[in-house]
């Protein structure tokens, strides 16, 4: 009786204390200097106002780019990844002609031959380097790559012999970690800020699933954002391998990196990879963060051969995720998809006063048909304004209330067709993102893991302790002929489960090790191993 009461109390104490410590650490972990700089960024941002541009049939004020993520070039798996990456760099980049290509991490696989361990293979990095060199893609566009957790496996320190990203990537030779790239097109400045949240040093698999920004790296990112403002940037995209929910940021408090990104009004979106759409369970892993920017996780190239086309059109950001070799590629930029409206940064008034529906169309063959239809209206032919821009006049005043549907049909000279449907609104009607997508992207991963662990611990141990206490009371009351009785199994719908739990709770040789093991998991190291290569010391990992 005494043991079970103590054990039960200890379980409750550990769970409550761990939650308290986690939240307390977030509250007291706010660096005052960082906080002051972010407050200054907000004040400065309130004085900046974008010029309101009219959405007509002009090809100006338009820029588009591509994103590819989680390539996982491997010595042991799926040899088609490399030749299809060659095809992407040759054919897709040539057809779409993006201003920028973002390669957001996990460029190589870095696994051992048994797929259990991790190792940086120089051959995988050579293949990546040779693809970019042989396809001449670096002379066609700006290629911005960043580390992923696989690119950082078994790396004892950055810029060492084991840090192959530095030697074989495009940006690794120029930038130690996070960096900024600004391009100018049509007189407008577009800035891309790369976030390197990889661990330093980089441990072996599987100990670097979550990224972290040190205080110095956070200061560096703020410096990049401030420099971007000084260069009078119009629109900014942040990108990295880890989603924001997977990045620890000591010094930024509970808001984390989202608090940093959201302080800059010119930031429209954060683009990432890493989660692989949870194995296809969340194929549309998108959300609008409370801080006022879109967060968009991209499905992987590794298995699904996905890439993203993003565009800024007259101050409005749109995107579409595409399967490799899926042609034609169609992206409607006006009216914008209602789900991805960014309040405070994109103007419904601009769409309301626009004169044309606008869409980008790309295909290896000549486009022979491009038509649009609004709601139950008739199909209307689009006019080609430039190589990729198609427009058609419309009357937005007819659609100023509620949600409406836009249909697009495109046919090319080789007989390939694409039919898309999207909803739009001109009055601010909001659509809801998928619940799982919001859960994964808006909540801190470490807190989600802590919650799941705490719930599992309670579900696993509390019934055992309750039945143990109940059994002890029954036995003591039986000796005194008391009123505490055993459960009547016929009155319970889970009689078989109760019987098994009751018996288990009475066998000390089973009950005590189970409770002890579970309590150990809350405070003891889970493994003792070499977390870093060529290390002379063991590391305790929990």
How would you label these PLM feature ranges?
Residues 1-100, 133-142, 327-542:
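Acidic, histidine-bearing metal-coordination/catalytic regions of metal-dependent phosphoesterases
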Residues 28-56, 113-230, 253-269, 275-322:
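Extended active-site neighborhood of metal-dependent phosphoesterases/phosphodiesterases
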Residues 64, 100, 190-192, 235-237, ...:
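Structural motif
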Residues 70, 105-106, 148-149, 241, ...:
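Active-site glycine-centered loops adjacent to acidic/histidine catalytic or metal-binding residues
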Residues 73, 109, 151-152, 244, ...:
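Active-site micro-motifs of SAM-dependent methyltransferase domains
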Residues 73-76, 112-113, 155, 247:
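Short N-terminal helix/helix-N-cap motif within the alpha/beta-hydrolase-1
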Residues 104, 110-113:
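Post-signal peptide N-terminal segment of secreted/secretory-pathway proteins
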Residues 104, 225-247:
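Short acidic, glycine-rich surface-loop motifs adjacent to enzyme active sites
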């Amino acid at each position: 009786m005494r043991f079970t009461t103590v054990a039960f109390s200890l379980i409750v104490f550990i769970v409550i204390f761990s939650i308290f410590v986690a939240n307390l650490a977030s509250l007291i972990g706010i660096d005052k200097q960082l906080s002051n700089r972010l407050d200054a960024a907000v004040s400065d941002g309130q004085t900046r106002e974008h010029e309101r541009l009219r959405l007509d049939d002009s090809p100006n004020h338009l820029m588009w780019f591509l994103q590819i993520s989680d390539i996982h070039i491997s010595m042991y798996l799926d040899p088609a990844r490399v030749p299809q990456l060659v095809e992407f760099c040759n054919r897709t980049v040539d057809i779409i002609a993006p201003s920028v290509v973002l390669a957001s991490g996990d460029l190589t696989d870095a696994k051992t031959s048994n797929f259990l361990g991790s190792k940086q293979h120089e051959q995988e990095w050579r293949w990546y380097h040779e693809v970019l060199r042989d396809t001449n893609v670096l002379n066609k566009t700006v290629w911005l790559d960043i580390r992923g957790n696989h690119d950082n496996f078994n790396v004892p320190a950055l810029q060492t012999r084991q840090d192959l990203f530095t030697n074989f990537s495009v940006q690794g030779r120029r930038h130690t970690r996070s960096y900024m790239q600004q391009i100018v097109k049509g007189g407008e400045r577009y800035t891309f800020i790369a976030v390197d949240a990889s661990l330093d040093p980089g441990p072996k698999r599987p100990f670097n699933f979550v990224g972290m920004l040190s205080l110095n790296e956070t200061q560096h990112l703020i410096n990049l954002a401030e420099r971007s403002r000084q260069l009078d940037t119009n629109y900014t995209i942040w990108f990295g391998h880890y989603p924001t929910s997977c990045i620890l940021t000591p010094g930024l408090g509970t808001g984390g990196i989202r608090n940093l990104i959201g302080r800059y009004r010119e930031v429209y979106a954060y683009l990432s990879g890493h989660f692989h759409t949870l194995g296809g369970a969340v194929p549309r892993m998108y959300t609008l963060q409370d801080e006022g920017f879109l967060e968009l996780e991209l499905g992987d190239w590794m298995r699904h051969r996905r890439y993203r086309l993003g565009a800024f059109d007259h101050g409005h950001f749109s995107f579409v995720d595409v399967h490799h070799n899926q042609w034609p590629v169609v992206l409607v930029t006006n009216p914008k998809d209602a789900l991805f409206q960014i309040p405070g940064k994109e103007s419904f008034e601009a769409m309301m006063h626009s004169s044309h529906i606008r869409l980008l169309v790309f295909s290896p063959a000549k486009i022979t048909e491009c038509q649009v239809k609004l709601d139950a209206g008739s199909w209307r032919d689009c006019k080609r304004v430039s190589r990729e821009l198609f427009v058609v006049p419309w009357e937005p005043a007819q659609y100023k209330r509620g949600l409406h549907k836009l249909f697009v049909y495109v046919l090319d000279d080789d007989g390939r067709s694409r039919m898309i449907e999207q909803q739009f609104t001109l009055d601010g009607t909001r659509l809801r993102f998928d619940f799982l997508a919001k859960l994964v992207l808006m909540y801190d991963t470490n807190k989600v893991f802590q919650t799941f662990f705490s719930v599992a611990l309670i579900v696993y141990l509390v019934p055992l302790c309750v039945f143990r206490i109940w059994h002890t009371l029954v036995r003591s009351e039986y000796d005194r002929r008391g009123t505490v009785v055993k459960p009547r199994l016929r009155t319970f719908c889970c009689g078989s489960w109760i019987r098994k739990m009751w018996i288990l709770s009475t066998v000390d040789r089973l009950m005590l090790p189970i409770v002890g093991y579970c309590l150990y998991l809350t405070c003891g190291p889970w493994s003792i191993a070499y977390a870093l290569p060529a290390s002379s010391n063991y590391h305790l990992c929990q």
